[in-house]
């Protein structure tokens, strides 16, 4: 397969047999371009102490294509730091957040979801169904309706590792931007 050849010849990480979305990066990544102002924007947020990840998307209604154009990928920072990074990319952009944030705390008894709302973010709970999200992303990838700017290095690194284990279970490791991708597509 072409992606295996690239891995062996050029040392480029490849999508393996257990890849969640076995679509070569070359078919997904695009050179950055200026996004038209009229394209709707949204971001998706996956929160955590070790890693908080955010991905931003712009939607071209004319061709039903979603472009992921920037990312925030940082660990060990307070919600106020992440919120500032989110607002710096457009405080007017609405977002979706991992619904599990309603139950997570960084300090006694306070929900992360509420922390982000208090920081002024316009967020709603994302649909966190793995099956629904994986299928929705797969549908867009295989029809060329999900594209990712090449500048999203962390996204690319996670994409090539996102896989199912030998028993068919999703490997929940280094998948924060893949989670945000599911949230933003659904």
Where are these regions (language model features)?
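ATPase catalytic-site recognition across NTP-hydrolyzing enzymes
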Residues: 1-45, 50
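Non-transmembrane alpha-helical segments in soluble domains
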Residues: 6, 113-117, 181, 185
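Hydrophobic/aromatic-lined pockets within catalytic cores
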Residues: 13-14, 61, 185
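Mg2+-dependent endonuclease catalytic cores in nucleic-acid-processing enzymes, primarily RNase H-like
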Residues: 40, 55, 62-172
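Single, functionally critical "micro-switch" positions that shape active/binding sites
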Residues: 45, 97, 174, 178
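Anionic group-transfer/hydrolysis microenvironments
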Residues: 46-48, 100, 181
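Short beta-strand scaffold segments in enzyme catalytic cores
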Residues: 52-57, 182
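Acidic, Mg2+-coordinating catalytic module of metal-dependent nucleases/exonucleases
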Residues: 168-186
């Amino acid at each position: 397969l072409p992606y295996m050849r690239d891995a062996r010849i050029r040392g480029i990480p490849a999508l393996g047999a257990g890849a969640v979305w076995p679509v070569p990066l070359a078919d997904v990544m695009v050179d950055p371009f200026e996004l038209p102002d009229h394209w709707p924007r949204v971001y998706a947020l996956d929160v955590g102490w070790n890693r908080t990840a955010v991905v931003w998307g712009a939607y071209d209604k004319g061709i039903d294509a979603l472009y992921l154009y920037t990312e925030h990928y940082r660990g060990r920072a307070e919600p106020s730091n992440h919120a500032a990074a989110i607002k710096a990319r457009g405080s007017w952009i609405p977002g979706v957040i991992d619904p599990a944030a309603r139950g997570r705390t960084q300090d006694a008894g306070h929900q992360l979801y509420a922390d982000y709302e208090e920081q002024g973010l316009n967020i709603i709970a994302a649909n966190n169904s793995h099956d629904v999200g994986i299928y929705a992303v797969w549908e867009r990838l295989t029809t060329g309706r999900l594209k990712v700017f090449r500048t999203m290095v962390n996204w690319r690194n996670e994409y090539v590792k996102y896989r199912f284990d030998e028993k068919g279970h999703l490997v929940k490791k280094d998948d924060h931007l893949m989670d945000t991708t599911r949230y933003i597509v659904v």
